[in-house]
Structures are given as structure tokens and as C-alpha cells.
């Protein structure tokens, strides 16, 4: 019973496939019909299957009809193939009988039959006769001399009157040849279609066509009788040739020789006496194939013809598009915004005078080196018939790409990006792989920066990992990660589900054309449901191998280390399939991508670079975006110094003059001078753009506000600890706007909040957002004096949520922090069994023992927690006022340094204002 029941159940996706409809439609119908199903992989009974077929009856009918048509076409095709095979066999038999038949043929009667034709062509008997002479006269030139008298005697007896009885007598005497002659005559008629293509090559045929065309032009009235006599003559002449010359070569010579004849009369008639053509198997099979392909019944060949025609049309269309593109390229100029007339003239192949004259005619008075705005450049381009495309200063000064030599290419480690939703265990997975605690320093388990790490496996192979931040605010950063990556590990928690961010990660990977390896995490939890995750992934467009797809899948537990080694094996297998190559030549100039940049107090600007080509070495001059520098030191992700870094190696680079942006390409230059020139060129263009923009924006915005009814702008200044966070914040904030208010970022930068930022905010009526950074003491006092709104965050999507709610007018009271006081560490003491204790001086306010504190180093937040102890001399105290010294230690944190500032605060509920 159980077996029968199992056999009578059907999967929804299979039924949908059979009906050729969407599985979702079938699933929807089953749910409406009261079926208890979860997904398209659920099973239904036979009754439900019949109901589905009933509902989708039209689709089923269509599918059945299509199936019937296919079967009918197949049957017809088989029948046609059988017919063609039989026809081929029949032709083979005819060919064999043809080769046997002429052996007992009479030699003497053939010329007499040829003389039969003149009575029909009564007007020109002389023209009809010479062909009888031609082959015979020309034959004596080869070896057989015996043939000459045989044919010459009838030629001497030329009178036409005598010719008729001569024909009748021999036919009556020999009844045998009569039987043979019709056979030889009928065969050429049946085989005429097959012989025709073969005749084109010979000289005889060319002569024949010319003669016939002449005859057609001169004597149209006798065209039919002439053709009939030619067919008869051809049959008889073939009979003679096959008997006269036993080997084929002699026959060929006889037939081919008359072309070189001297006599004009001979030339006229020579075409009628054709040699016997040997029937070729290839010709027969070719003709059969062409006949079959020409038949309308043949569905297969018809569809093939249709496909060929379609393909040809596509090729023609592609060619036309390519031509159009080439034409458009000729009229396309790529220029930076605010280019001068002189630069435009060079790009358009004109003189600067023509550009300036055109500007005058448009009512604009310009000089040769004056910068033109975007609209003016577009107008000038249109006037001269050019299409204008605006590019950035970096694109305008990009160094030429060099082609890699095949001998320099070697297999390189794969660059793997770990993607997935917030808190699904991406960093925990990388943490287990690296066997070091990365997670501890991250805020609330959320990765804030792109980290690049190289992992060495036990067998000596390497993998480079990019750990991208998980939240939607980091779309831009994650997109950057996908651009440099080879393989994506998509982490999905088995106790959760496929979230919007997971789908977003899938879309990024697909857009970048990167293969996905699915890692289903947290399988050690009791509520884990792996099959549900696979089903949801299939709906999101990722079909795992277990379900017949291409994406590899591995069940893992990042905490316990289950399945990690298998996951890495699958990643390496995917990398082997991709055949990843890198240029390992030491003669070329290296290049790489800036993954992340930050400002370090002792080291200056430090950037994480993923090397893509060549070897990056200490001392190399380079350009990255608008900044240049010289490699002062290279370090791996653990801070260990190295001398060089090859392809797919992440490395921290010291030696930048300015802060580069994440995603900038780092290019090593031949000399310091080249690097400086290129960087300066880019900086000039950028400064020009910024200057132009800042001088224009105010006037334009006033005009626009008047037009749109005072559309307000929320001005924002962003300060953060790294460039990647700034980019993500800026991108997120620019997307937030409603009909009344829009967000405008007037300034952004890396580092602590300074007095300059506060003054700019006061002048522009802006708010300041500090992401993992704090203001210095003077900036804080100035902000309080100016009554500015300065906000501090450590998680990006909290910023976006607050701004969005503020714009929607949905601000609820918030938990606001109130500063109590701050103290500065002036000396550090090491106390046994306790750890580091700071000797501190209270700068302002009052520091109490139970207050929450944060440790700031160079304005950047390092630690947030509580005081462990607060002492004056040897006594524990509850609070210390400004101007007094005290000893402090922090709960759970020991890394206190001289110069650190500890800020005490409390959380109070406050009405929001933004």
C-alpha cells in the first residue's frame, strides 16, 4: 500500500514542466484549491494532479498537440529517408545495368541511326550531317586506326534518299539491338536531372550551350523538334562510344577532342555529340538530399533552413549595428566637464577660433583658456555635429593598458568574497578559517569595512578572502568587492531564511558574472532547516547541485568548524574550472585596486591594496586616483612587514600623500616625476570641477527653490574613521529624499570632528554626523556655543533610519547621551594581577564611578564600556571634579596609552530634532 501511495504522488514542478507553465502558477492554483503545499517542490496526489490538468486544460491540449505534431514530423521524416534510400538503390541497379548493356551493341548501325535525323530537319540537311563526320574524322588521330574505314564509308554515301532504306533494313535484320537501344535511350532521360550538374565542367558542354543559344536565336520555330532529335542522337551516340572505346579514357579523349576542331561547320554541330558521362554516387546522393531538403513536408530540414536564414539575418543586423557604432564613434568626443575651447578644438579637429566664434554667435563671450560649463560644451558639440560624453578626471588621464604575454601568465590564488545577510555568520566563517578573533572589534557583529585576508591551506595552496559588510547601506562597497572577486561564498543561516540582502548579494554576483558557492551556516542549531533554504534559494535564482543546478552547496557550522574544509575544497575546485591566471612577470609595472583606506596617527595614510598584476615592491612610485606616493612599507593583514606582493595578494601599503578612495586603481609608474605629473594633472581637473561647482551651485539653487516653491535641503557634514564608511554613508543618504526636503552632503572627510567642520556647519546651517569618531575639546565647545546638532553613530543603518524618519516627520523621542566630563591619561602604570592603570587629569565636568565611558585615541573611538575603578591617591572615590588628578582602570579593556581621552556620559531621553 505504501509503495502504491508513494507512486501516485507527483511533484508540482514536474507537473508544471509537463504542462509547460510556470511552477508558481501551479502552486498558486493548488493553494486556492485547498492543497497543503509549501513550495514548488511539494508533492500532490493523483486527484489534485487531475484537478491541475483540468484547470490547465488549454495548456495540456496545446502540449499534446505539439507532441503529436513532433511525432508526425518524425514519422514523415523516417518515411522520406526510406524513400530516398529506395531511390538510391534503384539508381544503383540502373547504373549497373547501364554498364553491362552496351557490350553486345552493333558498331555498324550506330552511324546509320545518326543519318536518320536529316529528313526531320529538311531545310538544312547539310548542317545535320557534318556531326556524323566529326567524331569519326577526329578519332583516327588517336591509336585505333581500324575504326576509320568503318565510319568513313557511310560518309561517302551521302545521298539522303538512300539513307532511309538503309536505316530500315538493319533494324529489321537485328531485332536484338532494338531492345537494347530503348534501354539506353530511356536511361539518359531519367538520369538527365542528375547528369545536368556534372556536364557544366567540360569544354564540350560550353560549346553545346553556345550552339543551342545561336540556334534558338535564329530558328525559334524548330526549337522543339531540334531538342527531341538531340535527345535521340545523344542516346545513340552514347551507345556507340561505350562500345567503340572499351576503356573510359579513350572515350573521354574522343569526346573532348572536337573542341579544338579547325572547321567552322564542325564547330556548329559538335555540341550534339556528347561523351558518355559516368554516373557518380556523390552526385546521386547530393541530388537526393537537395530534393528532400526542398520538400515542404520535411520539418527538420525546413527548421534548419529557417534557423540558417534567421542566423544570417542576425549576422547582417549585427554587422549593421557594428557599422552604426563605428560611425557614432567617429562623432563621439569624450571630454571632462569644464573643458576649455582650446581642448574642445583639439578633440573635434577644429581651430580654437571656430569654437570661440560659435560661442559668440550663441551670445557667450569666452577666451581661449576659459572653462566652459557642461551645457555650453553640449551645445557646441551639437552645433558641430558631435555627440559629447563626459568622463571623470581619472578616466581622462588613464594610463594605457598593456597586454599580458602568455608566457608570463601563471595560475594565481582565487579572490573569494564572502557575502550574505546581517548576522548570518560571514565574519564568523572567516574567523574560523583564519583562526583568529576578527569579530571582537566589530560593532554589534556588523562588519564596517572591507577586510582583505590571505589564507594558506595545509597543502600549500592560498585563497584571498574579502569580507564585505553585510547591510544594504554597503551596496556600493559590496559591488566593489564583486568587481575584484573571482568566486562568491553566499552565507545563509539555516535557522533563518533568504533575506532581501541575500537576494541583493546574489544580484551583485550575477551582474559581475561571478560563480556562487552556497554555504548554509548554523546547521548545528536544532531549528535549522536546510531544505527550506535550498527551496528559497531556487526561487531567488540560485539552483544548487543537489537540485540539478550549477551552484555548489555546503552545509557548515562556522562556530564548530563543521564542513569548512569541504567548503574550501569546493571553492578551489571552482577556481580550477575557471583557470584563473595572473601576470607574474617582474619586468612589468604592477597595478592593483584600493580596497580600503584609513588614517593612522603614526603611519599616516594606510591603504589595503589587492594586487592584480605584477609585483608591488617597496620603493615603487605610484598613482592612485588623485593621490600619488612611494611605497614606504608593505604589510600583510597581521601587520608583518613583507618586501613584495604578487597577484591576488592583499597588502597594506604605506606611503600615500593623500587619502585615496576605495575602488581607485593603484598604478606603479616608471619614475617619481611621471607619478607626480599624472597626479597633479588629475588634481587640477578635480579642483577646477569643485571650484566651478561651488561657485555655480548657490545661484542655481536659489533659482530652483523659487521655481519649486522653496524646496528645502538638509545639509549634512560627514566625518568617519575610514573612506569606505564615508562612501557607503554618502550613497545611502543621497538616496533618501521626499517631496519637501532632500539631503545634500556639503563636506565629508576622514578623521575626528574639528573646529573647521563646526564653523562650516554653522555657516551652512548643517548637521554633523560622526561615524565612529568624536570631536576634539575645542570643536565640542564651539558646537555647544553655536547650538549645532552633532550626532554620533557606530552602525551605518542607524544613521540612514534616523535621517529617513526625520524627513518623514516621524521622529519619536530618542535616548540621547549627555556628556558628564572628560579626563586625559598622562601616565600608565602596570599593576600586577590588575593590569594597566592610567594616571589621569580631569579636563572638564565631573567623572563619576558608575558613568558609562568611551576611550578616544586621536578622536577615534577605541573602546566603549564602564570604569572598573576610580581612585584618588589610594582611596576609592565616587566622582572626581575638573582640575583634579585620579587613577582609573577600565572594565574588560587593558590597552590604555598616554594621551588617550576618557569621556564619561549618561543616557537621557530627549525629544528628537534634525
UniProtKB/Swiss-Prot annotation:
Cell compartments where the protein resides: Cytoplasm
Residues that bind GTP: 420-427, 467-471, 521-524
Residue numbers spanned by region G4: 521-524
Gene Ontology CC entries for this record: cytoplasm
Signal peptide: none
Primary localization class, coarse: cytoplasm
Record key words, sorted: Cytoplasm, GTP-binding, Initiation factor, Nucleotide-binding, Protein biosynthesis
SUPFAM superfamilies per UniProt: Initiation factor IF2/eIF5b, domain 3 (SSF52156), P-loop containing nucleoside triphosphate hydrolases (SSF52540), Translation proteins (SSF50447)
Gene Ontology terms for molecular function: GTP binding; GTPase activity; translation initiation factor activity
Region G3: start-end pairs: 467-470
Pfam family, one: IF2_N
Annotated stretches, region: Disordered: 246-271, 293-313
Regions of compositional bias (Basic and acidic residues) in chain numbering: 249-266
Name of this chain's protein: Translation initiation factor IF-2
Organism of this sequence: Chlorobaculum tepidum (strain ATCC 49652 / DSM 12025 / NBRC 103806 / TLS)
Lineage summary: Bacteria, Pseudomonadati, Chlorobiota, Chlorobiia, Chlorobiales
Gene encoding the protein: infB
